[in-house]
Amino acid sequence: MRGITLLACFTSVFADGNDPRDFDSDLLMPGFHFVPFPWDWQNDPNGPMWDPVHEKYHLFYQYQTPRMWGHAVSDDLVDWVQLPMALKREHWYDQGGDFSGSATVLDDDASTVVLTVSSSDNTEIFVALPEDRSDPYLTNWTLPDYNPIYTTDARDPTEIMKTSKGTYRIADGTAVGTEIWEVNAFEDIFTNDTWTKIGTFQSNDGGAYWECPDVFPLPGAEEANLWVSKYSRSGDHYYLGMYDEDAATFTPLERYEGNPKTYDHGPFYASKTFLDKKDDASRRVLWGWQRMDKPEDTWQGQTQGVPREVKALPVTGSNKVDESPFYLTNFPIKELETLRDEDSHVANALPGGAQSFEIHDDEPVLLDAVSGRMLDMKFDIDYLNDGAQACGIRVLWTPGSDEYTDVLIDQRWVRYRATKNIGCWHHHHCFHSPRFPRLSVKQERKNYLANSHIFICLHSITTHRFAPYSLALTENNVGTDVNFRVLVDSSIIEVFINFGEETQTLFSYPTTSTSVSVGLIGAHCVFHSFESWNMNPYQFDASLVM
């Protein structure tokens, strides 16, 4: 009965007038990426969590300047109710800001929910508790008098983790890596004299702070004791390795030593996962902050990426090497598909409704059956020969103009160059895929500013990083297909290659409402099974803060 009552509550608040978004006047406003209201700065997704008592998802995030904690709640990780701020700089230790941390539902009865928070000067770690645990929204939070629980030169504490021995641990980020603090009993969590630093989970020899650490067993690889150690520093990077609970240490797999992988090769940062136990399922859901390089005056171009499921997939065949038969993927959660407009579904979107379509030159081919500012598309590409260079799709396109964004896989060795008429900058991003190591994602967009061009390439470089996976297009593997999932949301594009084996967030800045067309582009490749949907915006109720 509780589920029915809460659903009725959500239905009533999603009434006309409670959603402040205006998609007609703001061409860049995303429809299915979370943006908080009132419009203001947001960044790190501090404390995503599932509350089993009230059957709600919560999202906490860095909000405004100086930083405080914003808060929203959902039944399904798709539609959201905006709540008042959870933390608002009310004590001596958080006057400079309530900076990043995590949320934890403690113990089997789930009676206790704790926010772990860091201070602006990276010295104080403190906790917050809900004022009323019976409130299904957990609207109001309090900072107990025993705060801060410990003082250290660290930041961004993780959730509180219970060990097999019944002790409780927190990991936080430091200039020398990820450190571990521990208390022996549940009641000791809520004191300021029992937390003890027990060691360094993983060392960082670079001397730069590891921000927003995340530590968790990789779903699907638990029997192999395969864990993820993630940190944020000029991107969100992770290692796969072995966790020794007794020693509280992490040892990366040999192929990851000194060479972490990356969740997303675009502006995706300060990510945080949580264990989702809804419907007795145990999945790991990933949130990440996406920051535009062209901030908006209203919502400031700061969004959260779509929630993604993190899990292991097996490495098969000749690519199975070293200690682990698994690799990590991150891919949109299934619930996102509820926003698909089924009336707009095109099962065979290629020209003529064909299952396959071959292109041989670089002239774009318009897809008459697909158009829109908010789209979900999936398709495969085969590369025909070693003359195949870059193949992909053109989106947010006004045919006959320079208003478009190309999302391409480029199998050549390419370099990265970006030029704007407001300055010039150069950068390199590298990834090496276990199955397609010489493929790269390239984006070209010509709509940032008038007469400006931006070329973005993810590229592989000659390296021994993953030498056992070396692959080139030869007579033996021509025809190997690459799977795409592309989400377009007005100004945000998320690209998932091979079901989340590699991902990239991109931004585009259309200037006209006619930039809605989609096309194929490339040479010497074949597109297969192109399927598309227009997407509906999520339901957003901001009435509690209006």
Give the predicted meaning of each segment:
Residues 210-213, 268-271:
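Repeated scaffold domains used in trafficking and secretory/extracellular systems
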Residues 216-217, 275:
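Short glycine/serine- and small hydrophobic-enriched flexible loop segments
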Residues 17-20, 234, 244-269, 275-546:
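Beta-rich accessory regions
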Residues 3, 119, 173-174, 187, ...:
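Short intrinsically disordered, low-complexity coil segments enriched in acidic
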Residues 5-6, 76, 105, 366, ...:
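Acidic/proline-rich low-complexity IDRs
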Residues 1-16:
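Fungal secretory targeting signals
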Residues 15-156, 160-211, 219-264, 286-354, ...:
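Beta-rich carbohydrate-recognition and catalytic domains
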